[in-house]
Amino acid sequence: MLTLKAIRGRASEAGLKSLADCAKYARTLTFQRKMTKALDRLETFFSVVKNPVVSCGGGKDSTAVAILARQVSPHVTIMCADPPNPLPDREEHVKELLRWLGGPYVRIPYPWDVEKVLAGEEAYPEGLKIRVLSAWQKEHGVDGVVLGIRAEESKRRSLAVRSRGAVYQMSGGWRCLPICDFTAEESLCVALMSDAPINPVYTRQDGTLDFNRIHDGTWWPHDGGDSLEWMRTWYPDYAGLYAQALAVQGEGCAPICVF
């Protein structure tokens, strides 16, 4: 398990320098002010909902909001969506993170036929994850969801955050984006300062790759760009699958994000 203590002792090793820098930044007044604002947003959200959940799949952003949400509402349920095509170290990390977080959680698979999509026999199930989670939320009377959405990730998300704000209501209930103004590094800071388990994928890039572009869940293209060389370097067994997926989906075609 990668934690702050381990990073402090191994900061000179490949892939850990930028994480060590994050740990230093986490002690600054600027970061502490952002943390206060994020917690204030959560306080507002929890004051208007009765049966909320926190969406957390083990990535840096969802880990950050899970940690912060549990500070405000210790018994809020963690909702974890499980893809059929995870990277090899995701499962162990998610289990470790959920153990560390403690409290109630639910894991919800959203299966689709990866082989048929790669073969071109079926279309990529755009929006399946959202549909499955929405159905589960409706079935269980969920009236609000905390999400690890950040404006920095894309122009689409930036515009959405600007128009809706950090706490808003949709037809399916309330939404809270406590870290919408955080950078990727600031998201990691939350986990670092809590000494929470950190997805090992963040040590596999020698401190040179933008944290916004790292694949920390599945190997399917998701960033509107081409991470094939990164896959070849850090997950060579999955590079071929990623290349097939690029050919099926098309380079530069990022999945539509609805939140």
Give the positions of each predicted feature.
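Nucleotide-activated chemistry modules centered on ATP-dependent adenylation/adenylyltransferase
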Residues: 1-259
